[in-house]
């Protein structure tokens, strides 16, 4: 398939630049992967669609304030976007400046902190913090929330809370697992009260999630790598859920990719997994674990719309997106959501 097959025209006003006042006040488009049937709902209607005994799997990564500003030794301004933390002092990062910083040169960050340019790895720079503090402490002090480019505004104080799930736990993401943004504590409690089981995996979403696919045919695309962790207790819960004939519902494409990575690493049998994954899911992929998913509306030609198309059928998904545009759903990170069931192969 060609990347251009996943293109669609989106009116600019449908890109959500701010979240709804209440997390669960979004709309929800339901898509039956088998029939292609669509339903226009409210996000809170999801409670009626998840059955007792179903297992919902969430990504509990925490978004770090990954964008920093500073100056090179020459005085030229630069912007740093963390791609991943290598340890307490070192990061891999995207650096934007008029000229790339040289190896061994110093970078002066806002707030008086200093970093040293250690090495260059293709388009990424390895930087080392020269401080008693850790990278996380410096990011919390001077970093900005790394809002995606299409939100097209500076980050605000409110984004520190709203571009973060209520159940975030493990710092390391530079983009939010956005399907999870719709859930508040009351909704999670209501799901549990109904007898729905809740589990957490971790996938530290990288800035690569926003990189455009720069090839013509999707099989040529080289997927970026991200760190994921699927613990043994989640594997056990999934086995119990499947044995009882219930569904595994992944909240977000990152949860889908975590679970399917764990199955891929052990050749189809789900086992605990911790490490880097570059799994690229596109039409033709056979899902091993996930039966249904909650997901936001994704960018045209992105690897994420390809994943949803693999799950529910290309024609069904593209038709659903056209319906969403006609019905003026809000798109992307701060936008509305879909509840999608898997197409039988």
From Swiss-Prot:
Enzyme class: transferase
Places the protein is found: Cytoplasm
Cellular component, GO annotation: cytoplasm
Signal peptide interval: none
UniProt keyword annotations, A-Z: Cytoplasm, Queuosine biosynthesis, S-adenosyl-L-methionine, Transferase
Gene3D superfamilies: QueA-like (3.40.1780.10)
Catalytic activity: 7-aminomethyl-7-carbaguanosine(34) in tRNA + S-adenosyl-L-methionine = epoxyqueuosine(34) in tRNA + adenine + L-methionine + 2 H(+)
Record-listed E.C. numbers: 2.4.99.17
GO terms of molecular function: S-adenosylmethionine:tRNA ribosyltransferase-isomerase activity
Pathway(s) it belongs to: tRNA modification; tRNA-queuosine biosynthesis
Assembly and interaction partners: Monomer.
Function: Transfers and isomerizes the ribose moiety from AdoMet to the 7-aminomethyl group of 7-deazaguanine (preQ1-tRNA) to give epoxyqueuosine (oQ-tRNA).
Protein family membership: Belongs to the QueA family.
Protein's name according to its UniProt entry: S-adenosylmethionine:tRNA ribosyltransferase-isomerase
Organism: Shewanella sp. (strain W3-18-1)
Organismal lineage: Bacteria, Pseudomonadati, Pseudomonadota, Gammaproteobacteria, Alteromonadales
Name of the encoding gene: queA
């Amino acid at each position: 398939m060609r990347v251009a097959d996943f293109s669609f025209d989106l009116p600019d006003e449908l890109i959500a630049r701010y979240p709804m006042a209440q997390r669960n006040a979004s709309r929800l488009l339901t898509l039956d992967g088998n029939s292609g049937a669509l339903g226009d709902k409210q996000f809170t209607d999801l409670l009626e669609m998840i059955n007792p005994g179903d297992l919902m799997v969430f990504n509990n990564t925490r978004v770090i304030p990954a964008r920093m500003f500073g100056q090179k030794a020459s005085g030229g301004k630069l912007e740093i976007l963390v791609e991943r933390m290598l340890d307490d002092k070192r990061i891999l990062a995207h650096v934007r400046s008029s000229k790339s910083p040289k190896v061994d040169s110093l970078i002066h960050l806002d707030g008086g902190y200093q970093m040293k340019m250690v090495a260059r790895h293709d388009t990424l720079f390895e930087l080392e913090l020269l401080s008693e503090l850790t990278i996380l402490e410096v990011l919390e002090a001077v970093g900005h929330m790394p809002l995606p480019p299409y939100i097209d505004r500076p980050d605000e104080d409110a984004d520190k809370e709203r571009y973060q799930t209520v159940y975030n736990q493990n710092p390391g993401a530079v983009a939010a697992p956005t399907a999870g943004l719709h859930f508040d504590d009351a909704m999670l409690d209501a799901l549990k009260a109904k007898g729905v089981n809740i589990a957490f995996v971790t996938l530290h979403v990288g800035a690569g999630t926003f990189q455009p696919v720069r090839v013509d045919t999707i099989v040529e695309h080289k997927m970026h790598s991200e760190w994921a962790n699927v613990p043994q207790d989640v594997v056990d819960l999934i086995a119990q859920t499947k044995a009882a004939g219930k569904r595994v519902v992944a909240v977000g494409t990152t949860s889908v990719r975590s679970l399917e990575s764990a199955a891929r690493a052990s050749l189809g049998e789900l086992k605990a997994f911790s490490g880097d994954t570059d799994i690229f899911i596109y039409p033709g992929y056979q899902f091993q674990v996930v039966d249904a998913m909650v997901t936001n509306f994704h960018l045209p030609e992105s690897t994420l719309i390809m994943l949803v198309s693999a799950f529910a059928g290309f024609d069904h998904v593209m038709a659903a997106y056209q319906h969403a545009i006609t019905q003026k759903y809000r798109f992307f990170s701060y936008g509305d959501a879909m509840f999608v069931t898997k197409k039988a192969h």
